[in-house]
Amino acid sequence: MKKLKASEIRQKYLDFFVEKGHMVEPSAPLVPIDDDTLLWINSGVATLKKYFDGRETPKKPRIVNSQKAIRTNDIENVGFTARHHTFFEMLGNFSIGDYFKQEAIEFAWEFLTSDKWMGMEPDKLYVTIHPEDMEAYNIWHKDIGLEESRIIRIEGNFWDIGEGPSGPNTEIFYDRGEAYGQDDPAEEMYPGGENERYLEVWNLVFSEFNHNKDHSYTPLPNKNIDTGMGLERMASVSQNVRTNYETDLFMPIMNEIEKVSGKQYLVNNEQDVAFKVIADHIRTIAFAISDGALPANEGRGYVLRRLLRRAVRFSQTLGINEPFMYKLVDIVADIMEPYYPNVKEKADFIKRVIKSEEERFHETLEDGLAILNELIKKAKATTNEINGKDAFKLYDTYGFPIELTEEIAVQAGLKVDMTTFESEMQQQRDRARQARQNSQSMQVQSEVLKNITSASTFVGYDTATAQTTLTHLIYNGEEVSQVEAGETVYFMLTETPFYAVSGGQVADTGIVYNDNFEIAVSEVTKAPNGQNLHKGVVQFGQVNVGATVSAEVNQNDRRDIQKNHSATHLLHAALKSVLGDHVNQAGSLVEADRLRFDFSHFGPMTNDEIDQVERLVNEEIWKGIDVNIQEMDIASAKEMGAMALFGEKYGDVVRVVNMAPFSIELCGGIHVRNTSEIGLFKIVSESGTGAGVRRIEALTGKAAFLYLEDIQEKFNTMKSQLKVKSDDQVVDKLTQLQDEEKALLKQLEQRDKEITSLKMGNIENQVEEINGYKVLVTEVDVPNAKAIRSTMDDFKSKLQDTIIILASNVDDKVSMVATVPKSLTNNVKAGDLIKQMAPIVGGKGGGRPDMAQGGGTQPENISKSLSFIKDYIKNL
């Protein structure tokens, strides 16, 4: 087997499957996007759910990825085992309704055993399968040539998480040899057992059944492949080391810990635990912060804080009693940089966050350990259990993690009264929930906000930055003097460049900072007394009231918002010009990436009207009109023709945004200085949102250009596929193809009729007399449901005085049609005939007395239904 670096294994895996026609799906951020069901991305397939559940169609049905992931369900095991991790990489190849077991197994075997790829010795590989999966067994045994003795049947080889896709799986194991254990079934020394000799290196899941609500299983219409190979584990096998922690993914970190601690790795088992905890946790923390997570007291932020504090606690067993974890970030960045440059790019920020957390926790730890040692003495002298209220006080007052209290208690031979602790925690949650309800996300006029009357001046019309003072901090519905890192806080500034959400325009985002702390601003709203109320998360440090700070708006977003807001005014004026003065704004949303405008109008706009509006807006952009903004009294504004928005309330002094002569409108938002800054305007959709209200969504500037570029790319592809040279030929070619298709379909229908007629022979000979009626009841072989109706038309023209009932099986679905001559409909009704027949084939139907149709899902009962209907007519 080749000895490969982890980065080489990753690249070989991706290259191999690209050669097999797979599309590389880039590793997604650890913080899930648009998936509230996950705290973290926890597997290779987690980011592909949109493809497997059909929400999106991938560009290719074959996908390969190397996905970073976090799992924290067994944190306490990390450090004590050879392969437990909170952060890991999962290599995976996936098929969305394309290849299945045969190719999946063949691909796996080739990648593992080929000298071009991993070069593993075939005689060291074993596999497990589900006992009933004979298809997988035959592929492994007959096609791959694996001896029967190396194929182990295990009942647990079935991937099933409840309702939804499920199926058997096959796992591939590598035999590391007798140095890791002698064969002994009693000790689970076999592939699939708990041992260190036979390591699972790859899991192939064959998703072929749907687990139904009634716990039955039915075959999936599209079978999928989902595989997973842990990079850390494969690296340990390739590099022939005992544990994942001895691979090149971890050893540079271990070497740095050795330098800082003066201790050696792989000398003392107890020390090794600390080495492994630190090395694992710093990878998780660095990557999570680089992907947008921050230490906090709840959610994923609490996971980070817990991991960091656990690592700091174990670092003390190595004699490290000062912040040092942040120094490992550069090591992690260097190891992972080839595939994950994000950590190196954000290394300075990551280090600042970690160092700030470490400093806080060292203070907490010193105070907390002194108190905990007293509690341990007390418990040993009495019940051998640390009181739950004491543990909660340690957690609540001193920030000492309960997990750490438990861990230290166990080391001292004690337990913690967790029942009482949880009771105290629940009471705290109830208090916090009540506080949240009272404050309603600070958007209601709480007593705290109503009592704040100090001024906060908005200066953002003229600047995106300001040197200012932080005057008020609100945390958990109460005004406070300081707030710690990781917490969500509301605050006010004496002067602020941040625009508060208003008039459909979203709030600015950005940062407020000084040398001691930084707040990432995510929302800005108006407080009851008119001040701009900022919401943000403390990135690092301790925030104090009275601090002098720099306030910086995200200028890229600000510029895009300005473009979209000014374009919204032009759009409003253009709609009035094209559609009429009845158009009034019914709502709007101005964001950085798009604009949305709701307006009153009677019905859908025509394509020509949309084109006219778009052209008008762009012409005003290309004219380069100066945008003049003035404050004046409402009377003067109306006199100059300023448009006031329907339903809006205005004060005595108003702000007029003037793009004369095309648009003059009252507005408090932020705008470009000249319409040419907008660059380009493109309407991307027009739709209805309710009675008399239409909605336009549009893009400006670069976003509009990229949208048009994408359309042009698709058009060029279509032109290439149509094999035409000029743009003008595309429509003519499409028209030609449509005409040809119609002609071919007509020919095909005629051919189908002729084939059906030949198969049926002389239909007059098949007519029976039943109960005095001429009746033709038969199954016909037709290519589609439409063909059964044309066959019926053909038969009717030949058998005008006959009751005709036809049934067909097309793609395991039953179609049936019945006709009754109008002269007979007083006695026999076609609708009744179909209603009687359809349930027999698991369906329903009906229609007029002279013509009816139906369908069903049980083609095996067609003959039964035809016999039944003959008896039914006989008994009329």
Swiss-Prot record:
Keyword RNA-binding: yes
GO cellular component: cytosol
Molecular function as annotated in GO: alanine-tRNA ligase activity; aminoacyl-tRNA deacylase activity; ATP binding; catalytic activity, acting on a protein; transferase activity; tRNA binding; zinc ion binding
BP term (GO), one: alanyl-tRNA aminoacylation
Cofactor(s) the record lists: Zn(2+)
Cross-referenced PROSITE patterns: AA_TRNA_LIGASE_II_ALA
Keyword Nucleotide-binding found: yes
Keywords: Aminoacyl-tRNA synthetase, ATP-binding, Cytoplasm, Ligase, Metal-binding, Nucleotide-binding, Protein biosynthesis, RNA-binding, tRNA-binding, Zinc
Cofactor annotation comment: Binds 1 zinc ion per subunit.
Catalyzed chemical reaction(s): tRNA(Ala) + L-alanine + ATP = L-alanyl-tRNA(Ala) + AMP + diphosphate
EC number: 6.1.1.7
Residues reported in the UniProt entry to bind Zn(2+): 565, 569, 667, 671
Subcellular compartments: Cytoplasm
Primary role: Catalyzes the attachment of alanine to tRNA(Ala) in a two-step reaction: alanine is first activated by ATP to form Ala-AMP and then transferred to the acceptor end of tRNA(Ala). Also edits incorrectly charged Ser-tRNA(Ala) and Gly-tRNA(Ala) via its editing domain.
PANTHER family, per the entry: ALANINE--TRNA LIGASE, CYTOPLASMIC, ALANYL-TRNA SYNTHETASE
Family: Belongs to the class-II aminoacyl-tRNA synthetase family.
Cross-referenced HAMAP family: Ala_tRNA_synth_B
Free-text comment on this protein's domains from its UniProt entry: Consists of three domains; the N-terminal catalytic domain, the editing domain and the C-terminal C-Ala domain. The editing domain removes incorrectly charged amino acids, while the C-Ala domain, along with tRNA(Ala), serves as a bridge to cooperatively bring together the editing and aminoacylation centers thus stimulating deacylation of misacylated tRNAs.
Protein name: Alanine--tRNA ligase
Organism: Staphylococcus aureus (strain MSSA476)
Lineage: Bacteria, Bacillati, Bacillota, Bacilli, Bacillales
